[in-house]
From Swiss-Prot:
Function: Involved in protein export. Acts as a chaperone by maintaining the newly synthesized protein in an open conformation. Functions as a peptidyl-prolyl cis-trans isomerase.
Organism: Streptococcus uberis (strain ATCC BAA-854 / 0140J)
Gene Ontology terms describing biological process: 'de novo' cotranslational protein folding; cell division; chaperone-mediated protein folding; protein transport; protein unfolding
Domain notes: Consists of 3 domains; the N-terminus binds the ribosome, the middle domain has PPIase activity, while the C-terminus has intrinsic chaperone activity on its own.
Gene (UniProt): tig
Name of the featured protein: Trigger factor
EC number: 5.2.1.8
PPIase FKBP-type domain ranges (all copies): 163-248
PANTHER family: TRIGGER FACTOR CHAPERONE AND PEPTIDYL-PROLYL CIS/TRANS ISOMERASE, TRIGGER FACTOR-LIKE PROTEIN TIG, CHLOROPLASTIC
Length: 427
């Protein structure tokens, strides 16, 4: 194989490489074997046409496209490796020449990783808003949330106030015509929760069980059902029950109900304080790490970031997100319907984040390279075992899912992040 690279512009160029007969002939054989089983030629049984007869009747050239598809991926990867290029995005392949009995010549327009000129990434000074301090108010708020979770709903005869739950039937109409999705029975609605469109819940404050009220509202202009957006609607609403929350007293009995490992409210407060301190410690460290990495990226210069890298990151993130949704039983169509968004909206959301992620990865990779970080066999094994434990998977399954190169890259990246953070100072 002969290879060459011609630089066309910053981070862009053309690879030209040849594919030798030692690779072409087996690929042609494979292409022929793939199609011969379907060949019907008079005088020969189906699938038993000899190769010389095939070449005579159809010409060997009809196999070239399939043969190229067979041999091209490995040949392209070999050319990239021989030229030691850091290629990103999919190449644009062109056939320069494909002549019988001669090596094939192929060209590939490629985009390469941009040069990263590192700035300061050690001994950085950063400011973060996160704090390690845990206040009494935060401890009390955590207990209050648990207390509210233990609250019971009790039917009352008095009029509903904000925070009460009403059990209602409702029928919605626009210009006197009922619409799909505008009807409900025995629906429990907490007043002030914001579950319904603006204005609906406010008008039920003051109602009592047995009352029927016409609730007049206007759908928001950006309402997900376009045929209702901006329109005035009337909901005939019948209140069946009004329920108020009864929360337990703030005492030692509450503490034991919340956590069976404690005996008193003071013990619960002490336990929650430790938990909050541990969580805040992690959040503080994460904030410092994030700020330090952001500063290291800002201090670096990336020479003309290729837009293809950003586009690829957008699609990677979108595919990952949609994959997670589908694993939860939510199809893309269902997600967009539930959120009132479109695929274009999601693309724009990820596009605004992708540029930052790509730049961050490039700078961390450059730091790893500058520091000469490599992963040892022991570190790779530890990473595999850690991942197996984290995801509750057999070690061998993790080993087959992740390539050694991927693990080496991830370990080197982690070491680079440690270099940034181990000397950082918080102002």
């Amino acid at each position: 194989m002969s290879t060459s690279f011609e630089n066309k512009a910053t981070n862009r160029g053309v690879i030209t490489f040849t594919i030798g007969q030692d690779k072409i002939k087996p690929a042609l054989d494979q292409a022929f074997n793939k199609i011969k089983k379907d060949l019907n030629v008079p005088g020969f049984r189906k699938g038993h046409l000899p190769r010389p007869i095939f070449n005579q009747k159809f010409g060997e050239e009809v196999l070239y496209e399939d043969a190229l598809n067979i041999v091209l991926p490995a040949a392209y990867e070999a050319a990239v490796a021989e030229l030691d290029l850091a290629v990103v995005a999919q190449p644009k392949i062109d056939v320069v020449s494909m002549e019988k009995g001669k090596d094939w010549e192929i060209s590939a327009e490629v985009v390469t990783k941009p040069e990263v000129k590192l700035g300061e990434y050690k001994d950085l000074a950063v400011e973060v808003e996160a704090s390690k301090e845990v206040t009494d108010e935060e401890v009390d708020a955590k207990i209050e949330r648990e207390r509210q979770n233990l609250a019971e709903l009790v039917v009352k005869e008095d009029a509903a106030v904000e925070g009460d739950t009403v059990v209602i039937d409702f029928v919605g109409s626009v210009d006197g015509v009922e619409f799909d999705g505008g009807k409900g029975e025995n629906f429990s609605l907490e007043l002030g929760s914001g579950q319904f469109i603006p204005g609906f819940e406010d008008q039920l404050v003051g109602t009592k069980a047995g009352e029927t009220k016409n609730v007049e509202v206007t759908f928001p202009e950006d309402y997900q059902a376009e045929d209702l957006a901006g329109k005035a609607a009337t909901f005939v609403t019948t209140v069946h029950e009004v329920k108020s929350k009864e929360v337990p007293a703030l005492d030692d009995e509450l503490a034991k109900d919340i956590d069976e490992e404690v005996e008193t409210l003071d013990e619960l407060k002490a336990k929650y304080r430790k938990e909050l301190e541990a969580a805040k410690e992690i959040a503080f460290d994460d904030a410092v790490e994030g700020a330090a990495i952001e500063l290291a990226v800002a201090n670096a210069e990336i020479v003309e970031l290729p837009e293809e890298m950003v586009h690829d990151e957008v699609h990677r993130a979108m595919n990952e997100f949609m994959g997670n949704m589908q694993r939860q039983g939510i199809s893309p169509e269902m997600y967009f319907q539930l959120t009132g968004t479109t695929q274009e909206d999601l693309h724009k959301q990820y596009e605004s984040e992708a540029d930052k992620r790509v730049k961050t990865n490039l700078v961390i990779e450059a730091i790893a390279k500058a520091e000469g970080f490599e992963a040892t066999d022991e570190e790779i094994e530890k990473e595999i075992n850690d991942l197996a434990t984290e995801y509750n998977m057999p070690v061998e399954q993790v080993r087959t899912l992740l390539s050694a190169d991927m693990l080496k890259h991830d370990i080197a990246m982690k070491k680079a992040v440690e270099v940034i953070t181990e000397t950082v100072k918080v102002k």
